[in-house]
Amino acid sequence: MRIAMWSGPRNLSTALMYAFGNRADFAVVDEPFYAAYLTQSGLDHPLRSEVLADQPNDPADVIAAMLAPLPKASPHVYHKHMTQHMTAGIPREWMRDVVNVFLIRHPARVVASFAAKFENPSLEDLGFVQQAELYDYVPVSYTHLTLPTKQA
């Protein structure tokens, strides 16, 4: 199973990623489109040069890695995605090949948490606009997600 967890900033998504990372049957990938986003946007984020050096900058390479065969040791993978990283130049067709889950926190709490660190955030900075677009793009095929359990 490939889970694409979609979140905006300040949604406690890292804590959820760590929870999946503690499962022996899951591999975890943190913000795979971050370098592609930084390349396309030109934004000067903290650790920009390190991210650009460590991650693929081409969205096609990111997608190929996300859809590559899974290792036997980790039959499932959890991708933590930030909705604001999905700019217009990043293809979305691959989303039909994964289980998409949207992590949504009360907007007032997101704004308060984000505004404590950054002045005058926009809806785009918070990922709300992109999350709505991605949600509308994904076909409704699951009403809930049940993770497989080990057989006793």
What spans do the regions from the language model cover?
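A structural motif corresponding to the C-terminal end of an alpha-helix
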Residues: 134-142
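Conserved phosphate-donor/acceptor-positioning beta-strand/loop module used by diverse small-molecule
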Residues: 97-113
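Surface-exposed cleft-lining segments at the edges of enzyme active sites
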Residues: 113-124
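PAPS-dependent sulfotransferase catalytic core
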Residues: 1-72
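Short, solvent-exposed loop/turn segments at secondary-structure junctions
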Residues: 10-11, 33-35, 83-86, 107-110, ...
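Active-site glycine-rich loop that binds ribose-phosphate moieties when present
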Residues: 127-134
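Conserved small/polar residues in nucleotide/adenosyl-binding loops
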Residues: 143-149
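Glycine-rich phosphate-binding loop used to anchor ATP phosphates in small-molecule kinases
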Residues: 68-88
